[in-house]
Regions:
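Feature marks short, highly hydrophobic, charge-poor N-terminal signal-anchor/signal peptide-like helices
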Residues: 1-11
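Single-pass alpha-helical transmembrane signal-anchor segments in small membrane proteins across taxa
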Residues: 9-21
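Core catalytic region of metal-dependent phosphoesterases/phosphodiesterases
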Residues: 31-36, 49, 54-151, 225, ...
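Beta-strand-turn-beta hairpins that frame and shape the catalytic cleft
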Residues: 36-47, 147-158, 204, 277-282
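Active-site neighborhood of phospho(di)ester-bond hydrolases with catalytic His/Asp-centered motifs
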Residues: 48-50, 74-79, 104-111, 143-144, ...
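Active-site environment of divalent metal-dependent phosphoester hydrolases
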Residues: 53-59, 81-86, 110-118, 147-149, ...
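Conserved beta-sheet core of the metallophosphoesterase superfamily
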Residues: 95, 103-107, 122-126, 214-297
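Active-site-proximal loop/helix segment associated with metal-binding centers of metalloenzymes
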Residues: 153-249
Length: 297
């Protein structure tokens, strides 16, 4: 009940400031560009949340309580799970979620295949940048790393991907894993070049993981350690437990960027925690308006 009241107040107070930015279809075969404008004269509302891993119950409740519209946009900071199994289960989930009355703007995480590798995605213009989309699911977009998007008049740079802390378990047990889960050198160069063109100034950063100096160390008990403690608490805690070999190169690179760019707010997911450290906002379960007055303080 309390959450419902909060969401209603959020919708009234923080309803957004600009009309929906619309989008254009870009044919992969060089055809004419068709423009589809959702603008009906009322402002779109922009929201943001963290990893979902195929669990969208909160999003469904949010859409129902807030009475969202297709023009409203929910940014998800990676690991949505839409391209996790690479089979019909993914299509079933996309079909179910595409029926929600909202547009999803998704970052690539590390627990899913990249859209460009799936083979069913085209490219479309959206809010000043390019996005991946599937014609069958026209309200589910994936951001392209290194693109700059304009939401409610404010520019955001997007960088997806991270290292999977359970990589060894995935490989041992045959669970889904992708070698290109982290941003590569080409992506990093593209991001740095775009930021330099903007004189290293951007309103916000949208990334899956966070800069190295902001790691939420309290979340770093390994997956195996957690599982062992749940099975046999005393025995597990008395032993020297498994410590994963974690590649922090993405976080280190983001840390270098964070030190040299001028930004107002930085949103990230990945760590399954709702927490703010300085201008870094980590998102998980919370669904909040993209812009709050205190973000500009």
């Amino acid at each position: 009940m309390c959450n419902s009241i909060i969401f209603i107040l959020m919708g009234v107070i923080f309803g957004g400031s600009l009309a929906f930015c619309g989008y254009s279809h870009i044919s992969k075969h060089g055809g004419k560009t068709a423009t589809f404008d959702y603008d009906d004269g009322t402002p779109a509302r922009f929201y943001i949340t963290g990893d979902k891993h195929r669990h969208f119950e909160r999003v469904k409740d949010f859409c129902r309580v807030m009475q969202t519209r297709r023009k409203d946009v929910l940014i998800i900071l990676g690991d949505e799970g839409f391209n996790y199994y690479d089979d019909k289960r993914d299509d079933e989930l996309k079909k179910e979620i595409s029926e929600l009355n909202i547009t999803l703007f998704c970052l690539h995480g590390n627990k899913e295949n990249r859209p460009q590798n799936v083979g069913t995605y085209g490219i479309r213009s959206f809010c000043g940048g390019k996005v991946y989309y599937e014609p069958k699911y026209p309200n589910i977009y994936f951001a392209i790393d290194g693109e700059i998007y304009t939401f409610e008049g404010k520019k955001y740079m997007v960088v997806g991907g991270a290292h999977s802390v359970d990589k060894l378990r995935c490989l041992e047990e045959g669970l889904p894993y992708w070698d290109d889960e982290m941003p590569g050198d080409e992506t990093k160069m593209s991001v740095e070049t775009r930021l330099e063109r903007n004189e290293n100034g951007i309103y916000g950063m949208l990334t899956h993981t966070c800069p190295i100096d902001y790691l939420p160390t309290e979340m770093f008990m390994s997956t195996r350690q957690n599982a062992a403690i749940k099975r046999k608490p005393r025995k597990a805690k008395s032993k020297k437990l498994f410590k994963p070999d974690i590649d922090r190169s993405t976080e280190i690179w983001l840390g270098e960027l964070e030190k040299k760019i001028d930004y107002k707010i930085w949103f990230c997911g990945h760590y399954h925690v709702d927490k703010q450290i300085d201008k870094i906002r980590m998102m998980h379960k919370e669904i909040r308006p993209l812009h709050l007055p205190e973000d500009d303080d």
